[in-house]
């Protein structure tokens, strides 16, 4: 049985996240199963009934967000980091002779763990049923697969990624996490549970008609506003004919506690290269990007680093031991465009690389001022360089708060 504990000083770290904001709460719990979540919510509801109160519940994952979504304002903190198990796998035919694979996990599974488990084909299968074991064997024997959503922070949890509809650099090609979520199990505030599978419940006449596993019926009016066609994190997702799964993805834990998540896995590209292109003028970088969007067909990511970002990295490299291994950027570089290439052959990757070089020359930049990462080790170094920017900003905020809280 999960215990609701007083949030004493020993739990102080759970009052903040990477936004550096700090909140307050009275109690905390660490459920391990869906039943634990239901039990905690039921106990809180019982206490509220006795006291005539209404306790807010802040649902947490890895607390890696920069928008204070995991910072409690009062009430109870429900931390899902101990709900980190694999629950099963599923396989089906894609209609073209290939196998589609899905993996079902608890929300506390960490991105870096899931990434390495997929790459090493090391998903633990203890407790899987027969259908899941058949899918697991197909995963073991088949070609490499991956999950495309790739936020920079590798200690993020899957539940947190789903709750905020995380995107990351690869959203340029694959979109945010929402379309890759195929099923959810959600515990509602009253303890009832929803088992949602993509394609089963869709908006009709402005309403989503949901049936809980306990037999309850919920009619959810879908907002009438029009969602922008670009990345958007404001408000609940709404669209004509939308799937019920999509309502909960990006809802930041405000509609219920996401306890199980099924993700679709994609075939991994044969070749993945990272290319960091440096420019002496911002206009060169803008012109390059506009042209590259048309001519680079295998790009999975494009990221822009301005002069201030490069300056922060240069400062941190010389003043912080944690960043001492950061490479020195080319002299005179004022901005950078990072391009990730995903190709089915090295020949195609080289073709795209020469296209990048040609585009740089056309905008007046020097194509020799690039970093090309072709190995896992080089790509990890490139990832460290990219992640160092937000991490450095957070460190600077911490330093300045010492003198200006």
Where are these regions (language model features)?
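Short beta-strand segments
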Residues: 60, 79, 106, 159-161, ...
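ATP-grasp fold ATP-binding core
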Residues: 57-61, 147-148, 302
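N-terminal flexible segment immediately upstream of the FAD-binding catalytic core
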Residues: 1-55, 62-101, 116-120, 126, ...
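Conserved hydrophobic/aromatic beta-strand scaffold that supports enzyme active sites
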Residues: 28, 77, 183, 276-278, ...
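C-terminal substrate-recognition/cap domain of FAD-linked oxidoreductases
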Residues: 4-11, 249-251, 257-405
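Residues at or immediately preceding the N-termini of alpha-helices
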Residues: 34-37, 83, 111, 282, ...
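FAD-binding subdomain of flavoenzyme oxidoreductases
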Residues: 87-89, 95, 107, 111-112, ...
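Short, ordered loop/turn segments at secondary-structure junctions
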Residues: 61-64, 199, 304-307
């Amino acid at each position: 049985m999960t215990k609701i504990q007083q949030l004493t000083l020993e739990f102080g770290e759970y009052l903040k996240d990477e936004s550096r904001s700090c909140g307050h709460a009275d109690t905390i719990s660490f459920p391990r199963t869906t039943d634990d979540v239901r039990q905690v919510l039921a106990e809180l509801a019982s206490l509220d009934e006795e006291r005539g109160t209404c306790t807010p519940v802040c649902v947490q994952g890895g607390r890696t967000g920069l928008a204070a979504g995991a910072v409690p304002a009062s009430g109870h903190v429900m931390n899902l980091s101990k709900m980190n198990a694999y629950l099963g796998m599923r396989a089906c035919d894609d209609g073209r002779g290939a196998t589609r694979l899905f993996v079902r996990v608890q929300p506390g599974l960490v991105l870096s763990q899931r990434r390495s488990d997929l790459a090493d084909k090391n998903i633990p299968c203890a407790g899987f049923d027969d259908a899941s074991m058949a899918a697991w064997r197909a995963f073991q024997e088949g070609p490499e697969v991956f999950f495309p959503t790739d936020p920079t922070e590798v200690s993020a949890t899957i539940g947190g990624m789903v709750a905020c509809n995380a995107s990351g650099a690869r959203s340029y090609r694959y979109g945010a996490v929402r379309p890759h979520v195929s099923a959810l199990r959600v515990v509602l505030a009253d303890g009832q549970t929803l088992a949602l599978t993509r394609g089963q419940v869709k908006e009709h006449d402005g309403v989503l008609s949901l049936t809980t596993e306990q037999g309850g019926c919920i009619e959810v009016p879908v907002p009438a506003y029009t969602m922008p066609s670009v990345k958007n994190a404001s408000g609940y997702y709404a669209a004509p004919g939308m799937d019920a799964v999509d309502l909960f993805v990006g809802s930041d834990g405000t509609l219920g506690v996401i306890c199980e998540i099924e993700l679709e896995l994609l075939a991994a590209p044969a070749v993945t290269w990272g290319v960091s292109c440096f420019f002496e003028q911002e206009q060169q970088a803008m012109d390059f990007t506009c042209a590259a969007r048309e001519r680079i067909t295998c790009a999975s990511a494009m990221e822009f680093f301005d002069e201030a970002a490069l300056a922060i990295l240069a400062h941190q490299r010389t003043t912080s031991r944690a960043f001492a291994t950061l490479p020195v950027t080319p002299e005179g570089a004022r901005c950078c465009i990072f391009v990730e290439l995903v190709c089915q052959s090295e020949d195609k990757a080289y073709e795209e690389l020469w296209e990048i070089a040609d585009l740089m020359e056309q905008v007046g930049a020097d194509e020799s001022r690039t970093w090309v990462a072709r190995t896992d080790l080089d790509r990890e170094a490139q990832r460290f360089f990219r992640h160092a920017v937000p991490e450095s900003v957070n460190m600077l905020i911490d330093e300045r708060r010492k003198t200006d809280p």
